[in-house]
Amino acid sequence: MSSNIFKRFKSAEESLDEDESVTPVYIPKAKRAKLEALKAKKSQIASRLSTHKQQSAPTTTTNTSTTASTTTTATTNNTNNSKPSIQTKKPTGKKFQFDWDVEEEDTASGFVPLIEMDEEIDDPLFSGQESTHWTNKNLEEMTDRDWRIFKEDYNITTKGKNIPNPLRYWNEGSINDKLVSIISQLGYEEPTSVQRASIPLALKKRDVVGVAETGSGKTLAFLIPVLNYILSIDENYLKYEKISNEPVGLILAPTRELALQITKEAEKFCKKLGYQVLPIIGGHHYQDTINKIDQTGVHLIVATPGRLVDSIERKIVDLSKCYCLVMDEADRMIDMGFEKDLNKVLDKLPTEKQLSSTIDGRIFHLEKRSTMMFTATISPTVEKLTKKYLIDPGYLYIGGAGEALDNISQSFEFLSSATTEATKFNKLIKIIRSHWRVTENPLIIIFANFKHVCDSLSQELSSNDINNVVIHGSKSQDMREQAITNFRNHESEVLIATDVAARGIDIPNVTLVINYQMVKKFDEYIHRIGRTGRAGNLGESFTFISDQDTEIFTPLKKFLKKGGKRLPDWLYKHQSQTVQE
Protein backbone atom coordinates (compact mmCIF):
# COMPACT_ATOMS: atom_id res chain seq x y z
CA MET A 1 0.00 0.00 0.00
CA SER A 2 2.91 2.33 0.76
CA SER A 3 4.27 1.96 -2.75
CA ASN A 4 1.07 3.45 -4.20
CA ILE A 5 1.50 6.58 -2.08
CA PHE A 6 4.97 7.32 -3.41
CA LYS A 7 4.24 6.39 -7.06
CA ARG A 8 1.33 8.81 -7.67
CA PHE A 9 1.91 12.47 -8.65
CA LYS A 10 2.28 14.94 -5.81
CA SER A 11 -0.59 17.30 -5.14
CA ALA A 12 -0.24 20.97 -4.32
CA GLU A 13 -0.67 20.12 -0.62
CA GLU A 14 2.27 17.68 -0.70
CA SER A 15 4.49 20.13 -2.53
CA LEU A 16 3.69 22.74 0.09
CA ASP A 17 4.40 20.24 2.86
CA GLU A 18 7.91 19.48 1.49
CA ASP A 19 9.13 22.97 0.59
CA GLU A 20 9.10 25.84 3.08
CA SER A 21 10.22 28.39 0.50
CA VAL A 22 7.02 28.45 -1.53
CA THR A 23 4.13 30.81 -1.00
CA PRO A 24 1.59 29.45 1.53
CA VAL A 25 -1.67 28.35 -0.07
CA TYR A 26 -5.06 28.46 1.56
CA ILE A 27 -6.35 24.92 2.23
CA PRO A 28 -10.13 24.59 2.45
CA LYS A 29 -11.47 23.02 5.56
CA ALA A 30 -12.90 20.08 3.63
CA LYS A 31 -9.40 19.07 2.47
CA ARG A 32 -7.61 19.52 5.79
CA ALA A 33 -8.79 16.14 7.12
CA LYS A 34 -7.46 14.41 4.00
CA LEU A 35 -4.12 16.18 4.39
CA GLU A 36 -3.85 15.17 8.03
CA ALA A 37 -4.57 11.53 7.09
CA LEU A 38 -1.83 11.66 4.48
CA LYS A 39 0.62 13.00 7.03
CA ALA A 40 -0.32 10.22 9.42
CA LYS A 41 0.38 7.54 6.77
CA LYS A 42 3.75 9.10 6.00
CA SER A 43 4.59 9.09 9.66
CA GLN A 44 3.69 5.38 9.93
CA ILE A 45 5.87 4.48 6.95
CA ALA A 46 8.80 6.46 8.31
CA SER A 47 8.37 4.65 11.62
CA ARG A 48 8.49 1.25 9.88
CA LEU A 49 11.63 2.18 8.02
CA SER A 50 13.39 3.28 11.19
CA THR A 51 12.82 -0.10 12.87
CA HIS A 52 14.94 -1.79 10.17
CA LYS A 53 17.88 0.54 10.58
CA GLN A 54 20.75 0.10 13.03
CA GLN A 55 21.39 3.82 13.06
CA SER A 56 19.33 6.82 14.14
CA ALA A 57 16.17 7.83 12.28
CA PRO A 58 16.84 9.70 9.01
CA THR A 59 16.58 13.42 8.77
CA THR A 60 13.52 13.22 6.55
CA THR A 61 11.45 11.86 9.46
CA THR A 62 12.32 14.84 11.66
CA ASN A 63 11.71 17.23 8.82
CA THR A 64 8.19 15.85 8.45
CA SER A 65 7.09 17.25 11.78
CA THR A 66 9.00 20.45 11.18
CA THR A 67 7.39 20.86 7.81
CA ALA A 68 3.99 20.14 9.25
CA SER A 69 4.49 22.78 11.92
CA THR A 70 5.63 25.29 9.37
CA THR A 71 2.67 24.51 7.17
CA THR A 72 0.25 24.97 10.07
CA THR A 73 1.79 28.31 10.95
CA ALA A 74 1.67 29.44 7.37
CA THR A 75 -1.95 28.42 7.11
CA THR A 76 -2.86 30.31 10.29
CA ASN A 77 -1.09 33.42 9.08
CA ASN A 78 -2.95 33.18 5.81
CA THR A 79 -6.25 33.14 7.69
CA ASN A 80 -5.53 36.00 10.12
CA ASN A 81 -3.63 38.35 7.80
CA SER A 82 -4.69 39.78 4.48
CA LYS A 83 -1.06 39.75 3.26
CA PRO A 84 0.62 36.45 3.97
CA SER A 85 4.33 36.43 4.76
CA ILE A 86 6.54 34.96 2.06
CA GLN A 87 9.76 33.10 2.99
CA THR A 88 12.61 33.69 0.58
CA LYS A 89 16.14 32.26 0.24
CA LYS A 90 19.30 34.23 -0.19
CA PRO A 91 20.33 34.35 -3.87
CA THR A 92 23.38 32.20 -4.64
CA GLY A 93 24.12 33.47 -8.12
CA LYS A 94 23.42 30.01 -9.62
CA LYS A 95 20.92 29.44 -12.38
CA PHE A 96 19.42 26.50 -10.49
CA GLN A 97 19.17 26.53 -6.70
CA PHE A 98 18.99 23.32 -4.68
CA ASP A 99 18.92 22.47 -0.99
CA TRP A 100 21.75 19.97 -1.49
CA ASP A 101 25.14 19.77 -3.17
CA VAL A 102 24.55 17.97 -6.46
CA GLU A 103 28.21 17.03 -6.90
CA GLU A 104 29.02 15.83 -3.38
CA GLU A 105 25.90 14.29 -1.91
CA ASP A 106 24.78 10.78 -2.93
CA THR A 107 21.69 9.16 -1.42
CA ALA A 108 22.54 5.66 -2.66
CA SER A 109 24.53 4.86 0.48
CA GLY A 110 21.47 5.53 2.59
CA PHE A 111 19.33 2.88 0.91
CA VAL A 112 17.82 0.44 3.38
CA PRO A 113 15.46 -2.27 2.09
CA LEU A 114 12.11 -2.68 3.80
CA ILE A 115 12.87 -6.37 4.45
CA GLU A 116 16.25 -8.12 4.57
CA MET A 117 16.32 -11.92 4.37
CA ASP A 118 19.27 -14.33 4.37
CA GLU A 119 17.24 -17.29 3.10
CA GLU A 120 16.21 -17.80 -0.53
CA ILE A 121 12.58 -17.11 -1.36
CA ASP A 122 10.66 -20.14 -2.59
CA ASP A 123 9.27 -18.35 -5.62
CA PRO A 124 7.62 -20.55 -8.28
CA LEU A 125 8.80 -18.09 -10.94
CA PHE A 126 12.38 -19.24 -10.31
CA SER A 127 11.67 -22.95 -10.02
CA GLY A 128 13.77 -25.10 -12.34
CA GLN A 129 16.36 -22.35 -12.92
CA GLU A 130 19.35 -24.28 -11.59
CA SER A 131 22.75 -22.67 -11.18
CA THR A 132 24.80 -25.89 -11.34
CA HIS A 133 26.35 -26.51 -14.75
CA TRP A 134 26.04 -29.98 -16.30
CA THR A 135 29.80 -30.53 -16.00
CA ASN A 136 29.39 -30.59 -12.21
CA LYS A 137 26.57 -33.14 -12.23
CA ASN A 138 26.40 -36.90 -12.31
CA LEU A 139 24.65 -38.52 -15.25
CA GLU A 140 21.51 -39.33 -13.26
CA GLU A 141 21.25 -35.69 -12.13
CA MET A 142 21.02 -34.33 -15.68
CA THR A 143 17.72 -32.58 -16.42
CA ASP A 144 16.08 -31.85 -19.77
CA ARG A 145 17.40 -28.31 -19.49
CA ASP A 146 20.93 -29.65 -18.91
CA TRP A 147 20.72 -31.76 -22.05
CA ARG A 148 19.52 -28.77 -24.08
CA ILE A 149 22.50 -26.75 -22.86
CA PHE A 150 24.79 -29.71 -23.58
CA LYS A 151 23.61 -29.93 -27.20
CA GLU A 152 24.05 -26.18 -27.63
CA ASP A 153 27.58 -26.38 -26.21
CA TYR A 154 28.54 -29.01 -28.79
CA ASN A 155 26.41 -27.77 -31.72
CA ILE A 156 24.31 -30.93 -31.91
CA THR A 157 20.89 -30.89 -33.59
CA THR A 158 18.75 -34.01 -33.92
CA LYS A 159 15.67 -35.04 -35.87
CA GLY A 160 13.66 -38.22 -35.46
CA LYS A 161 11.84 -40.27 -32.85
CA ASN A 162 13.35 -41.38 -29.55
CA ILE A 163 16.84 -39.98 -30.08
CA PRO A 164 18.93 -40.88 -26.99
CA ASN A 165 20.87 -38.22 -25.12
CA PRO A 166 24.44 -37.58 -26.30
CA LEU A 167 27.53 -39.14 -24.76
CA ARG A 168 29.18 -36.98 -22.10
CA TYR A 169 32.23 -39.13 -21.30
CA TRP A 170 33.54 -42.41 -22.72
CA ASN A 171 32.82 -44.38 -19.54
CA GLU A 172 29.20 -43.21 -19.23
CA GLY A 173 27.77 -44.93 -22.28
CA SER A 174 27.04 -48.58 -22.93
CA ILE A 175 30.35 -49.05 -24.75
CA ASN A 176 32.07 -52.38 -24.09
CA ASP A 177 34.67 -52.09 -21.32
CA LYS A 178 37.37 -53.45 -23.64
CA LEU A 179 36.76 -50.62 -26.06
CA VAL A 180 36.72 -48.00 -23.30
CA SER A 181 40.11 -49.27 -22.14
CA ILE A 182 41.59 -49.13 -25.66
CA ILE A 183 40.16 -45.63 -26.19
CA SER A 184 41.99 -44.51 -23.06
CA GLN A 185 45.22 -46.24 -24.11
CA LEU A 186 45.13 -44.52 -27.50
CA GLY A 187 44.78 -41.12 -25.84
CA TYR A 188 41.27 -40.12 -26.89
CA GLU A 189 40.41 -37.93 -23.91
CA GLU A 190 36.90 -36.73 -24.77
CA PRO A 191 34.45 -37.51 -27.57
CA THR A 192 33.98 -34.98 -30.37
CA SER A 193 30.53 -33.60 -31.15
CA VAL A 194 29.76 -36.16 -33.86
CA GLN A 195 30.97 -38.99 -31.61
CA ARG A 196 28.84 -37.76 -28.71
CA ALA A 197 25.73 -37.70 -30.89
CA SER A 198 26.09 -40.80 -33.08
CA ILE A 199 27.53 -43.44 -30.73
CA PRO A 200 24.56 -43.62 -28.30
CA LEU A 201 22.09 -43.81 -31.21
CA ALA A 202 24.07 -46.53 -33.01
CA LEU A 203 24.49 -48.55 -29.80
CA LYS A 204 20.69 -48.63 -29.61
CA LYS A 205 20.90 -50.47 -32.98
CA ARG A 206 19.12 -47.58 -34.67
CA ASP A 207 20.00 -46.49 -38.19
CA VAL A 208 21.98 -43.25 -38.24
CA VAL A 209 22.27 -40.38 -40.74
CA GLY A 210 25.07 -38.08 -39.61
CA VAL A 211 25.49 -34.74 -41.37
CA ALA A 212 29.02 -33.61 -40.58
CA GLU A 213 32.12 -32.34 -42.35
CA THR A 214 35.25 -34.42 -42.87
CA GLY A 215 37.70 -33.90 -40.03
CA SER A 216 35.04 -33.77 -37.30
CA GLY A 217 35.92 -37.19 -35.87
CA LYS A 218 33.52 -39.28 -37.96
CA THR A 219 35.87 -42.28 -38.23
CA LEU A 220 35.74 -43.03 -34.51
CA ALA A 221 32.03 -42.15 -34.48
CA PHE A 222 31.26 -45.23 -36.58
CA LEU A 223 34.21 -47.48 -35.63
CA ILE A 224 33.18 -47.66 -31.97
CA PRO A 225 29.61 -48.89 -32.72
CA VAL A 226 30.89 -51.36 -35.36
CA LEU A 227 33.48 -52.88 -33.02
CA ASN A 228 31.01 -52.84 -30.14
CA TYR A 229 28.64 -54.86 -32.34
CA ILE A 230 31.34 -57.40 -33.26
CA LEU A 231 32.11 -57.85 -29.56
CA SER A 232 28.44 -58.73 -28.96
CA ILE A 233 28.43 -61.56 -31.53
CA ASP A 234 28.45 -65.13 -30.23
CA GLU A 235 32.07 -65.96 -29.33
CA ASN A 236 31.92 -69.47 -30.78
CA TYR A 237 30.85 -68.10 -34.14
CA LEU A 238 33.75 -65.65 -34.25
CA LYS A 239 36.16 -68.34 -33.10
CA TYR A 240 35.33 -70.87 -35.79
CA GLU A 241 34.30 -68.60 -38.66
CA LYS A 242 37.05 -66.00 -38.44
CA ILE A 243 39.08 -67.66 -41.24
CA SER A 244 36.19 -67.50 -43.69
CA ASN A 245 35.57 -64.86 -46.34
CA GLU A 246 32.34 -63.72 -44.69
CA PRO A 247 32.93 -60.38 -42.94
CA VAL A 248 30.49 -59.27 -40.24
CA GLY A 249 31.07 -55.55 -40.80
CA LEU A 250 31.48 -53.36 -43.89
CA ILE A 251 32.65 -49.74 -44.25
CA LEU A 252 32.33 -48.06 -47.66
CA ALA A 253 34.35 -44.97 -48.65
CA PRO A 254 34.55 -43.00 -51.93
CA THR A 255 38.34 -43.04 -52.41
CA ARG A 256 41.29 -45.32 -51.83
CA GLU A 257 43.02 -42.75 -49.63
CA LEU A 258 40.06 -42.42 -47.29
CA ALA A 259 39.61 -46.20 -47.17
CA LEU A 260 43.27 -46.64 -46.18
CA GLN A 261 42.96 -43.99 -43.46
CA ILE A 262 39.91 -45.73 -42.00
CA THR A 263 41.74 -49.08 -42.16
CA LYS A 264 44.73 -47.63 -40.34
CA GLU A 265 42.51 -46.28 -37.57
CA ALA A 266 40.56 -49.55 -37.30
CA GLU A 267 43.76 -51.59 -37.02
CA LYS A 268 44.68 -49.76 -33.81
CA PHE A 269 41.62 -51.33 -32.17
CA CYS A 270 41.44 -54.63 -34.06
CA LYS A 271 45.00 -55.67 -33.18
CA LYS A 272 44.19 -55.35 -29.49
CA LEU A 273 40.87 -57.18 -29.91
CA GLY A 274 42.17 -59.98 -32.15
CA TYR A 275 40.04 -59.01 -35.15
CA GLN A 276 41.10 -58.81 -38.79
CA VAL A 277 40.41 -55.71 -40.90
CA LEU A 278 41.01 -55.76 -44.65
CA PRO A 279 41.01 -52.93 -47.24
CA ILE A 280 39.56 -53.80 -50.65
CA ILE A 281 40.55 -50.96 -52.96
CA GLY A 282 41.88 -50.35 -56.45
CA GLY A 283 45.62 -50.52 -56.98
CA HIS A 284 45.96 -53.76 -54.99
CA HIS A 285 46.16 -57.13 -56.75
CA TYR A 286 43.17 -59.44 -56.30
CA GLN A 287 45.51 -62.30 -55.40
CA ASP A 288 46.90 -60.28 -52.49
CA THR A 289 43.37 -59.93 -51.12
CA ILE A 290 42.70 -63.65 -51.55
CA ASN A 291 45.96 -64.60 -49.81
CA LYS A 292 45.21 -62.26 -46.90
CA ILE A 293 41.75 -63.79 -46.36
CA ASP A 294 43.13 -67.34 -46.63
CA GLN A 295 45.82 -66.63 -44.04
CA THR A 296 43.91 -64.69 -41.37
CA GLY A 297 40.27 -64.48 -42.38
CA VAL A 298 38.41 -61.20 -42.15
CA HIS A 299 35.97 -59.63 -39.67
CA LEU A 300 35.76 -56.10 -41.04
CA ILE A 301 36.14 -54.85 -44.62
CA VAL A 302 36.88 -51.25 -45.64
CA ALA A 303 36.25 -50.83 -49.37
CA THR A 304 35.52 -48.57 -52.29
CA PRO A 305 32.24 -49.48 -54.07
CA GLY A 306 33.64 -50.35 -57.50
CA ARG A 307 36.40 -52.65 -56.26
CA LEU A 308 34.05 -54.35 -53.81
CA VAL A 309 31.54 -55.15 -56.58
CA ASP A 310 34.35 -56.78 -58.57
CA SER A 311 35.44 -58.77 -55.51
CA ILE A 312 31.89 -59.99 -54.88
CA GLU A 313 31.47 -61.06 -58.50
CA ARG A 314 34.81 -62.93 -58.33
CA LYS A 315 33.59 -64.73 -55.16
CA ILE A 316 36.50 -63.29 -53.18
CA VAL A 317 34.17 -62.05 -50.42
CA ASP A 318 30.67 -62.99 -49.34
CA LEU A 319 28.42 -60.42 -47.63
CA SER A 320 25.70 -62.88 -46.54
CA LYS A 321 26.62 -62.45 -42.85
CA CYS A 322 27.30 -58.72 -42.98
CA TYR A 323 24.60 -57.12 -40.83
CA CYS A 324 26.55 -53.97 -39.97
CA LEU A 325 27.09 -51.33 -42.68
CA VAL A 326 28.73 -47.88 -42.72
CA MET A 327 28.68 -45.48 -45.67
CA ASP A 328 31.18 -42.67 -45.16
CA GLU A 329 30.89 -39.56 -47.35
CA ALA A 330 27.85 -40.99 -49.10
CA ASP A 331 27.31 -37.74 -51.00
CA ARG A 332 30.77 -37.99 -52.53
CA MET A 333 30.30 -41.62 -53.54
CA ILE A 334 27.22 -40.55 -55.49
CA ASP A 335 28.90 -37.45 -56.95
CA MET A 336 31.77 -39.62 -58.17
CA GLY A 337 29.39 -41.91 -60.04
CA PHE A 338 29.26 -44.82 -57.59
CA GLU A 339 25.48 -44.82 -57.15
CA LYS A 340 25.00 -47.90 -59.33
CA ASP A 341 27.81 -49.83 -57.59
CA LEU A 342 26.49 -48.71 -54.23
CA ASN A 343 23.07 -50.14 -54.96
CA LYS A 344 24.65 -53.42 -56.10
CA VAL A 345 26.53 -53.73 -52.82
CA LEU A 346 23.51 -52.91 -50.68
CA ASP A 347 21.39 -55.45 -52.53
CA LYS A 348 23.93 -58.16 -51.60
CA LEU A 349 23.49 -57.56 -47.87
CA PRO A 350 21.27 -59.88 -45.79
CA THR A 351 17.70 -58.86 -44.96
CA GLU A 352 15.48 -58.85 -41.87
CA LYS A 353 13.79 -62.00 -43.14
CA GLN A 354 17.09 -63.85 -42.98
CA LEU A 355 17.55 -62.77 -39.37
CA SER A 356 14.09 -63.91 -38.31
CA SER A 357 14.00 -67.17 -40.27
CA THR A 358 17.48 -68.50 -39.52
CA ILE A 359 19.80 -68.96 -36.57
CA ASP A 360 21.45 -65.63 -37.43
CA GLY A 361 19.11 -63.72 -35.12
CA ARG A 362 20.48 -65.58 -32.07
CA ILE A 363 24.10 -65.47 -33.24
CA PHE A 364 24.22 -61.76 -34.02
CA HIS A 365 21.62 -60.58 -31.44
CA LEU A 366 19.85 -58.44 -34.03
CA GLU A 367 16.34 -57.93 -35.33
CA LYS A 368 17.39 -55.89 -38.36
CA ARG A 369 20.48 -54.78 -40.20
CA SER A 370 22.33 -51.83 -38.65
CA THR A 371 23.26 -49.00 -41.03
CA MET A 372 25.16 -45.77 -40.47
CA MET A 373 25.46 -43.12 -43.18
CA PHE A 374 27.62 -39.99 -42.97
CA THR A 375 27.40 -37.15 -45.44
CA ALA A 376 28.30 -33.46 -45.71
CA THR A 377 24.97 -32.61 -47.36
CA ILE A 378 21.54 -34.22 -47.75
CA SER A 379 21.06 -34.16 -51.52
CA PRO A 380 17.93 -35.61 -53.19
CA THR A 381 19.93 -38.67 -54.25
CA VAL A 382 21.21 -39.23 -50.72
CA GLU A 383 17.66 -38.84 -49.40
CA LYS A 384 16.45 -41.41 -51.91
CA LEU A 385 19.17 -43.82 -50.79
CA THR A 386 18.22 -43.25 -47.17
CA LYS A 387 14.54 -44.01 -47.73
CA LYS A 388 15.34 -47.18 -49.69
CA TYR A 389 17.88 -48.84 -47.40
CA LEU A 390 17.58 -47.29 -43.91
CA ILE A 391 14.81 -48.05 -41.42
CA ASP A 392 13.48 -45.23 -39.21
CA PRO A 393 16.84 -43.43 -39.04
CA GLY A 394 17.78 -40.73 -36.58
CA TYR A 395 19.20 -37.60 -38.20
CA LEU A 396 22.15 -35.90 -36.51
CA TYR A 397 23.36 -32.47 -37.62
CA ILE A 398 26.76 -31.56 -36.24
CA GLY A 399 28.12 -28.03 -36.00
CA GLY A 400 27.96 -25.92 -39.14
CA ALA A 401 27.95 -28.71 -41.71
CA GLY A 402 27.34 -27.09 -45.07
CA GLU A 403 27.82 -23.59 -43.62
CA ALA A 404 30.68 -21.12 -43.71
CA LEU A 405 33.86 -22.33 -42.02
CA ASP A 406 34.45 -19.80 -39.24
CA ASN A 407 37.93 -21.04 -38.31
CA ILE A 408 39.32 -20.64 -41.85
CA SER A 409 40.38 -17.23 -43.17
CA GLN A 410 39.62 -16.97 -46.88
CA SER A 411 41.68 -14.70 -49.16
CA PHE A 412 41.35 -14.16 -52.90
CA GLU A 413 43.46 -12.79 -55.76
CA PHE A 414 41.41 -11.56 -58.70
CA LEU A 415 43.38 -11.97 -61.93
CA SER A 416 42.66 -9.69 -64.87
CA SER A 417 42.70 -10.98 -68.42
CA ALA A 418 46.13 -9.39 -68.87
CA THR A 419 47.71 -11.45 -66.07
CA THR A 420 50.29 -13.87 -67.43
CA GLU A 421 50.93 -17.38 -66.14
CA ALA A 422 54.41 -16.30 -65.04
CA THR A 423 52.95 -13.47 -62.93
CA LYS A 424 50.48 -15.86 -61.35
CA PHE A 425 53.20 -18.39 -60.53
CA ASN A 426 55.46 -15.72 -59.00
CA LYS A 427 52.55 -14.71 -56.77
CA LEU A 428 52.20 -18.36 -55.72
CA ILE A 429 55.88 -18.47 -54.72
CA LYS A 430 55.45 -15.31 -52.61
CA ILE A 431 52.40 -16.75 -50.83
CA ILE A 432 54.22 -19.98 -49.96
CA ARG A 433 57.37 -18.28 -48.66
CA SER A 434 55.39 -15.67 -46.75
CA HIS A 435 53.40 -18.44 -45.07
CA TRP A 436 56.58 -20.29 -44.15
CA ARG A 437 58.00 -17.19 -42.43
CA VAL A 438 55.06 -16.77 -40.07
CA THR A 439 53.94 -20.38 -39.53
CA GLU A 440 55.52 -23.10 -37.44
CA ASN A 441 55.62 -26.55 -39.11
CA PRO A 442 53.63 -25.46 -42.18
CA LEU A 443 51.87 -27.94 -44.45
CA ILE A 444 50.41 -26.57 -47.69
CA ILE A 445 48.03 -28.22 -50.17
CA ILE A 446 47.80 -26.73 -53.68
CA PHE A 447 44.75 -27.71 -55.74
CA ALA A 448 44.59 -27.69 -59.54
CA ASN A 449 41.87 -28.89 -61.89
CA PHE A 450 44.07 -30.84 -64.29
CA LYS A 451 46.78 -33.46 -63.94
CA HIS A 452 49.17 -31.73 -66.34
CA VAL A 453 48.88 -28.49 -64.33
CA CYS A 454 49.79 -30.41 -61.16
CA ASP A 455 52.88 -31.86 -62.85
CA SER A 456 53.95 -28.46 -64.23
CA LEU A 457 53.55 -26.80 -60.84
CA SER A 458 55.60 -29.55 -59.22
CA GLN A 459 58.49 -29.03 -61.64
CA GLU A 460 58.45 -25.24 -61.27
CA LEU A 461 58.29 -25.39 -57.47
CA SER A 462 61.16 -27.88 -57.37
CA SER A 463 63.25 -25.52 -59.52
CA ASN A 464 62.58 -22.85 -56.87
CA ASP A 465 63.83 -25.13 -54.07
CA ILE A 466 60.35 -25.91 -52.77
CA ASN A 467 60.14 -29.62 -51.97
CA ASN A 468 56.77 -31.05 -53.00
CA VAL A 469 54.82 -34.20 -53.84
CA VAL A 470 51.99 -34.80 -56.32
CA ILE A 471 48.91 -37.04 -56.34
CA HIS A 472 46.43 -37.41 -59.19
CA GLY A 473 44.61 -40.13 -61.07
CA SER A 474 47.57 -41.09 -63.25
CA LYS A 475 49.78 -41.85 -60.26
CA SER A 476 49.94 -45.48 -59.11
CA GLN A 477 48.47 -46.41 -55.75
CA ASP A 478 51.92 -46.99 -54.26
CA MET A 479 53.13 -43.59 -55.47
CA ARG A 480 50.07 -41.86 -54.03
CA GLU A 481 50.43 -43.58 -50.67
CA GLN A 482 54.14 -42.70 -50.50
CA ALA A 483 53.41 -39.08 -51.40
CA ILE A 484 50.83 -38.76 -48.62
CA THR A 485 53.21 -40.40 -46.13
CA ASN A 486 56.00 -37.96 -47.04
CA PHE A 487 53.63 -35.03 -46.71
CA ARG A 488 52.21 -36.22 -43.40
CA ASN A 489 55.74 -36.66 -42.00
CA HIS A 490 56.82 -33.17 -43.18
CA GLU A 491 59.40 -34.64 -45.55
CA SER A 492 57.63 -32.56 -48.19
CA GLU A 493 55.80 -29.47 -46.99
CA VAL A 494 53.76 -28.96 -50.16
CA LEU A 495 51.23 -31.39 -51.64
CA ILE A 496 49.85 -30.72 -55.13
CA ALA A 497 46.61 -32.56 -55.93
CA THR A 498 43.47 -32.79 -58.00
CA ASP A 499 40.07 -32.93 -56.29
CA VAL A 500 39.41 -36.64 -56.86
CA ALA A 501 42.83 -37.68 -55.57
CA ALA A 502 42.64 -35.51 -52.45
CA ARG A 503 39.04 -36.28 -51.49
CA GLY A 504 38.90 -37.84 -48.05
CA ILE A 505 42.51 -37.16 -47.09
CA ASP A 506 42.56 -36.42 -43.37
CA ILE A 507 45.82 -34.73 -42.41
CA PRO A 508 45.10 -32.74 -39.23
CA ASN A 509 47.84 -30.10 -39.36
CA VAL A 510 47.41 -28.57 -42.83
CA THR A 511 47.92 -24.83 -42.31
CA LEU A 512 47.20 -23.43 -45.80
CA VAL A 513 45.14 -24.46 -48.83
CA ILE A 514 45.82 -22.73 -52.16
CA ASN A 515 43.36 -22.99 -55.04
CA TYR A 516 45.66 -22.41 -58.00
CA GLN A 517 42.66 -23.04 -60.25
CA MET A 518 39.13 -22.32 -59.04
CA VAL A 519 36.64 -25.19 -59.00
CA LYS A 520 33.73 -25.52 -61.42
CA LYS A 521 31.33 -26.82 -58.74
CA PHE A 522 31.07 -24.68 -55.63
CA ASP A 523 30.72 -27.66 -53.27
CA GLU A 524 34.26 -28.62 -54.24
CA TYR A 525 35.48 -25.24 -52.99
CA ILE A 526 34.10 -26.04 -49.54
CA HIS A 527 35.67 -29.50 -49.61
CA ARG A 528 39.01 -28.05 -50.68
CA ILE A 529 39.37 -25.39 -48.01
CA GLY A 530 38.02 -27.90 -45.49
CA ARG A 531 41.39 -29.69 -45.69
CA THR A 532 42.69 -27.03 -43.28
CA GLY A 533 41.28 -25.75 -39.99
CA ARG A 534 40.54 -29.26 -38.72
CA ALA A 535 39.87 -30.45 -35.16
CA GLY A 536 39.27 -26.88 -33.97
CA ASN A 537 42.55 -25.50 -35.37
CA LEU A 538 42.77 -22.28 -37.34
CA GLY A 539 43.45 -22.46 -41.07
CA GLU A 540 44.01 -20.27 -44.11
CA SER A 541 42.95 -20.50 -47.74
CA PHE A 542 44.07 -18.51 -50.76
CA THR A 543 42.26 -18.66 -54.10
CA PHE A 544 43.22 -17.38 -57.55
CA ILE A 545 40.08 -16.37 -59.43
CA SER A 546 39.21 -14.59 -62.67
CA ASP A 547 36.33 -13.68 -64.96
CA GLN A 548 36.39 -17.25 -66.26
CA ASP A 549 34.96 -18.34 -62.89
CA THR A 550 31.83 -16.15 -62.91
CA GLU A 551 29.53 -19.17 -62.46
CA ILE A 552 31.02 -19.53 -58.98
CA PHE A 553 30.53 -15.87 -57.98
CA THR A 554 26.90 -16.10 -56.87
CA PRO A 555 27.22 -19.17 -54.59
CA LEU A 556 30.54 -17.82 -53.27
CA LYS A 557 28.88 -14.51 -52.41
CA LYS A 558 26.07 -16.28 -50.55
CA PHE A 559 28.56 -18.51 -48.74
CA LEU A 560 30.70 -15.60 -47.53
CA LYS A 561 27.70 -13.49 -46.49
CA LYS A 562 26.16 -16.38 -44.58
CA GLY A 563 29.38 -16.80 -42.63
CA GLY A 564 29.67 -13.08 -41.88
CA LYS A 565 32.77 -12.74 -44.08
CA ARG A 566 33.68 -9.51 -45.87
CA LEU A 567 33.01 -9.55 -49.61
CA PRO A 568 36.05 -8.72 -51.79
CA ASP A 569 35.61 -5.61 -53.93
CA TRP A 570 35.50 -7.54 -57.19
CA LEU A 571 32.78 -9.83 -55.83
CA TYR A 572 30.78 -6.92 -54.43
CA LYS A 573 30.93 -5.16 -57.81
CA HIS A 574 29.77 -8.32 -59.53
CA GLN A 575 26.85 -8.44 -57.10
CA SER A 576 25.89 -4.85 -57.90
CA GLN A 577 26.01 -5.48 -61.63
CA THR A 578 23.83 -8.55 -61.22
CA VAL A 579 21.22 -6.58 -59.30
CA GLN A 580 21.17 -3.81 -61.90
CA GLU A 581 20.72 -6.28 -64.73
UniProtKB/Swiss-Prot annotation:
Enzymatic class: hydrolase
Keyword ATP-binding among record annotations: yes
GO cellular component: catalytic step 2 spliceosome; cytoplasm
Gene3D superfamilies tied to this protein: P-loop containing nucleotide triphosphate hydrolases
Residue stretches of biased makeup (Low complexity): 59-82
Catalysis: reaction(s): ATP + H2O = ADP + phosphate + H(+)
Placement of sequence motif DEAD box: 328-331
Annotated Helicase C-terminal domain residues: 424-575
Domain spans labelled Helicase ATP-binding: 199-396
Residues bound to ATP: 212-219
Keywords: ATP-binding, Cytoplasm, Helicase, Hydrolase, mRNA processing, mRNA splicing, Nucleotide-binding, Nucleus
Protein family according to the UniProt entry: Belongs to the DEAD box helicase family. DDX23/PRP28 subfamily.
Subunit structure, interactors included: Component of the U5 snRNP complex.
Function: ATP-dependent RNA helicase involved in mRNA splicing. May destabilize the U1/5'-splice site duplex to permit an effective competition for the 5'-splice site by the U6 snRNA, resulting in the switch between U1 and U6 at the 5'-splice site. May also act to unwind the U4/U6 base-pairing interaction in the U4/U6/U5 snRNP, facilitating the first covalent step of splicing.
Protein name: Pre-mRNA-splicing ATP-dependent RNA helicase PRP28
